[in-house]
Design a protein with these regions (language model features):
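Non-globular targeting/processing and membrane-anchoring segments
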Residues: 1-112, 195, 202, 207-352
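Short, thiol/selenol-centered motifs that function as redox-active sites or metal-ligating centers
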Residues: 63-74, 90, 114-142
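Thiol-based oxidoreductase modules, predominantly thioredoxin-like and allied folds used
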Residues: 79-128, 153-183
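Active-site/pore-lining binding-face segments in mid-to-C-terminal subdomains
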Residues: 143-148, 152-228
Length: 352
């Protein structure tokens, strides 16, 4: 209903006219996204990839952004996103009044516009989706599947065990956790108004008309504060990620957190386990990438970080972008001068 990905009957009691109006506008935006960003960015990035890359993607700071992950890695079979945002409770839509349904769908259109129009999602929009009748994160994920021609076939909520294995929540657990609200993961964020049972999800989807096995993708999203004081002490999450190696990675619009010492655990995980990464300037600074055996290729223009960040790393990036080739599309943040830019970080060729 929110993603308008098929013609399945609406839940009983929902106003079909309101949903029809919503889907008309959303479908229009899907078309624009496919005709602009997907057609331009996806083949460009594909041409930069070496053969034989892993099909397992890890996207830290990827709140709501499955759509860009599928554009960047259309060959992916498994995608893990992690961010401060919780997945959300889908059950509240049942029996919602027409007035509230209209307002909720308007909110989803407004908060998803950054991803669909500007290939970027503002923090404020991600926060808004943490409260209300329609869960923002889940909605964005379903919209991403619709844009890329996938149909969801399974939705489960989960937690990680200490060894990194996955434990799916049972109906009994969902009921038992009903009144235990999800934890606020950052004091400046908006607190979720739903149960902690809906922190993390697993979505399985299949390409429309495709083979249920060969054309299947698994997406897992984890509500996670990725700083060293939280992610750094979460053995279950760290072991889950280690079990996925080797991986390809991406990040964008990540507030330059990978530049900071307080996020060294997630940065080191990427450097130890990835073979290829696509990012904007919020990716990994050359100081760390070069030491770990990576080479970096810059595209577009970069003169200064969009947000305040390390002067030394800014200087390193200015050098890296000095002779960069042009970039015609936006990939995450613009720089301080509103220039488009993109960074490829890949394992250096083995010495002969």
């Amino acid at each position: 209903m929110v993603a308008c990905g098929n013609d399945a009957p609406l839940p009983e009691g929902l106003d079909a006219k309101i949903v029809e109006e919503h889907c008309k506008e959303v479908t229009r935006r899907y078309g624009l996204y496919r005709d602009t960003w997907v057609k331009e960015a996806s083949p460009f990035i594909q041409n930069l990839k070496p053969a034989g890359l892993p099909t397992t993607v890890v996207y830290p700071f990827g709140g709501g952004d499955l759509i860009s992950a599928l554009t960047t890695y259309p060959e992916a079979k498994e995608i893990t996103t992690m961010s401060l945002e919780h997945a959300g409770d889908p059950r509240r839509i049942k029996g919602i009044a027409a007035k509230q349904l209209k307002a909720s769908l308007q909110m989803i259109r407004a908060t998803s516009s950054g991803l669909l129009v500007a290939n970027d999602s503002k923090t404020e929009n991600l926060m808004k989706g943490q409260r209300g009748e329609i869960p923002g994160q889940l909605s964005f994920f379903l919209m991403a599947l619709a844009v890329h021609g996938y149909e969801p076939v399974s939705l489960k909520y989960l937690k990680t065990n200490a060894d990194g294995s996955i434990r799916y929540l049972t109906q009994t657990e969902l009921t038992d956790l009903e009144k235990k609200e999800a934890k606020l993961l950052n004091k400046v964020w908006v607190a979720p108004d739903f149960s902690e049972a809906f922190d993390n999800l697993e979505l399985i989807a299949v390409k429309k008309g495709g083979d249920p096995v060969k054309d299947r993708i698994v997406h897992r999203h984890f509500a996670q504060n990725l700083d060293d004081d939280h992610f750094g002490k979460d053995d279950g999450m760290k072991n889950y990620l280690k079990a996925r190696t080797p991986i390809v990675a991406m990040t964008k619009a990540a507030s330059y957190l990978l530049w900071r010492d307080a996020f060294s655990t997630i940065r080191n995980y990427l450097l130890d386990n990835m073979v290829f990464m696509v990012s904007d300037s919020t990716g990994i600074p050359p100081k760390f990438a070069t030491k770990a055996g990576f080479v970096q290729e810059a595209w577009g223009k970069f003169n200064q970080s969009f947000l305040g960040a390390s002067a030394d790393y800014n200087a390193d990036f200015v050098k890296l972008w000095k002779d960069a080739k042009p970039l015609s599309f936006r990939y995450g943040y613009l720089d301080k001068g509103l220039s488009k830019h993109m960074l490829i970080t890949k394992k250096a060729p083995a010495a002969k």
